[in-house]
Amino acid sequence: ISASVWVESETGQTWWGKDSIVTISYTKKSYYYNYKYEPYTQNRYFIDTRDLDINGKYRLCVSIPGIGEYVTPFREVMIAQEIDSLSYRLGPDNSVMNLMLSSSGNEGQSKYYRWNYREDWENNPPIMPQVTYNYKDNSIGTLSYEVKDSLQKCMAFSHSYDILVYNTNQLSENRLENYLFLSFPTMDRRMVGLYCLTLYQTPLDREGYDFYKAMSVNDNLGGLYAPYPNEIMGNVLCTTNSNKVALGYVNVCTRSMKRIFIDGGKLNLIDR
């Protein structure tokens, strides 16, 4: 479905989105295989908002031919709370890796937080191949040192999937100290070598927090009495048909970022 997506200011300025068409062409001639990926469209749209005036008000607009027009309310730009630090702590018997954050908001900043992150780590294979098979002439060859070295130095990555939100309403200060946001076993492949986590923090208003909190409860529990997705109302409205329900919540804000590196190899947690 081809759609038009743009950000609109309260004064009428527009910033148009670009749909993502990813082209990957990859050919490996060292071995016997030949990979080629054709261009594809993911129906994702990117809007460069870096030059927007933070003192303005903005909304998201979507137009889908034959389906409808969708808009969000105009919102002021919320400034993200700074991430003061990222740290880690090993659990009992060094069996669990716990990642924690500390953050402090200034006077007037939101007390509602949302996070997402990206993980990158060295993914060295536990068993290295020594030979290769060429199906064209039915021959077996030996992998060179250069090839084995390139296979041994691999990287893997992952993104957060869980909805991570929190608020400081019950605290005396708008501050988080060593808040635990991620845990995983130290036996995990992520701890074999160098590990990097990049954390992104964005502020939410109360309505946005309630939306994501309801979504997280529905995602974690499910069950007979869990709310249906269309019962969790966001702030995306269809202006051409009020009976249509759009899922999602759009916030207007900046975001802060912090990165931590952990050398799992130097920790020597388990003899691998």
Located regions from the model:
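A sequence/structural signal for flexible, mid-protein segments enriched
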Residues: 1-272
